[in-house]
Amino acid sequence: MQVSVETTEGLGRRLTISVPAEQIEKMVKDGITREAKRARLPGFRPGKVPLSEINKRYGQAIRQDVMGEVMQRNFIEAIIAEKLNPAGAPTFMPGKSVGESFEFVATFEIYPEITLTGLDTIAVEQPKAEVNDADLDAMIETLRKQHATFAVVERASAAGDKVKMNFVGSIDGEEFDGGKADDFELEIGSNRMIPGFETGVTGHKAGETFDIEVSFPEDYHAENLKGKAAKFAITLTEVQAAQLPEVNDEFATLFGITSGGVDALKAEIRKNMTRELEQALKANVKEQVINGLLAANDVTIPSALIDGEVEVLRKQAMQRFGGQTKNMPELPAELFTEQAERRVKIGLLLGEVIKTSELKAEDSRVQALIASMASAYEDPAEVVAYYNSNKEMMQNMRNVALEEQAVEALLKSAKVTTKEVAFEEFMNKASGRA
């Protein structure tokens, strides 16, 4: 076998491989002989079919199989000999005879050679937060509101109330499509309506008729309403006030607390809040580290890896539609390209961190990750057992553990400062509510 390597563009490589023709002819002959031994043809005894008959019937197919095997086998031998690391499957060009050799071409991309740089320039502001009594009280108040009942009241509406109304909207004196409703229910403070609408409804009693003037936002979804000033004629028909449940043992049972009452409920809520806070703090630091790593290391990435990641993201997006994708057009790759590129770069760079730091997934860390995740379920022991019995899920958790270890390794050389933050402020920002 003779091999020549060319660089086409960037990470692209072209291998030209020559194989002695006699080697191929021998493989074809051996293939015909094997087929003759197992062939069952009318007019011939089993195993006695002439080789010429086998060649006439199956020779072309056997030769094609041999060519495919020759290309695959010699390609693998060639990349090992040339120390090439392909990213994705190769494309084989049709082979041709050159003198006494069979020559074929394989084109592919290789993984980039990565040398990590600028690790000491990564800047991380590590947030520090804890769950205090005020945070716990605020969470309990939120849970009370979530389990509130509503009762009709004879007073002016206020924030937190539910109101029922009839309204007609108009622009320049003309009604517009979608601007009219009867028995429309709205919770004041939900921010469901355009700016100014809920404020205009606040302070009115059932039975009152009044007008409010508002403007549709410039980014409103309906093109014909963007930025337009509108008037709504409103008749308020009902005001309901929230009735919050008392925090007692009965309230605790709503959350699966069967013993220990309010104290047990508070302990469980604090535990859950602390777990979520720790996860959010860890995710925040990880994002900063990865952003710094990307900024310090520009990596050329193989298009084959991007294409593969695009397909993964596309399938995930389709699955979020609940599998109802039969009649849906395929989502364009452009929707996922930027995210795919980022994910591939992160994978390559973290992979290099793991390799250069000689990291291996620590069993204790893997089990701690599983236990932490399982604690959010009703039967944690069952979840832990399920993970430990599933090879694929265990491998996923090992990958998560390795990522954590890689981030910790990067933190050792990063410029780290700390900042005290309030629980509510930090969690709102982490969830995108700030």
From Swiss-Prot:
GO molecular function: peptidyl-prolyl cis-trans isomerase activity; protein folding chaperone; ribosome binding
Residue ranges of domain PPIase FKBP-type in the record: 160-245
Cell membrane keyword on record: no
Gene3D superfamilies: 3.10.50.40, Trigger factor ribosome-binding domain, Trigger factor, C-terminal domain
Chief place where the protein resides: cytoplasm
InterPro entries listed in its UniProt record: PPIase_dom_sf (IPR046357), PPIase_FKBP_dom (IPR001179), Trig_fac (IPR005215), Trigger_fac_C (IPR008880), Trigger_fac_C_sf (IPR037041), Trigger_fac_ribosome-bd_bac (IPR008881), Trigger_fac_ribosome-bd_sf (IPR036611), Trigger_fact/SurA_dom_sf (IPR027304)
Location in the cell: Cytoplasm
Keywords assigned: Cell cycle, Cell division, Chaperone, Cytoplasm, Isomerase, Rotamase
EC number: 5.2.1.8
Protein name: Trigger factor
Reaction equation(s) it catalyzes: [protein]-peptidylproline (omega=180) = [protein]-peptidylproline (omega=0)
HAMAP family in the record: Trigger_factor_Tig
Family: Belongs to the FKBP-type PPIase family. Tig subfamily.
GO annotations of cellular component type: cytoplasm
Domain notes: Consists of 3 domains; the N-terminus binds the ribosome, the middle domain has PPIase activity, while the C-terminus has intrinsic chaperone activity on its own.
One GO BP: protein transport
Keyword Protease: no
Signal peptide: none
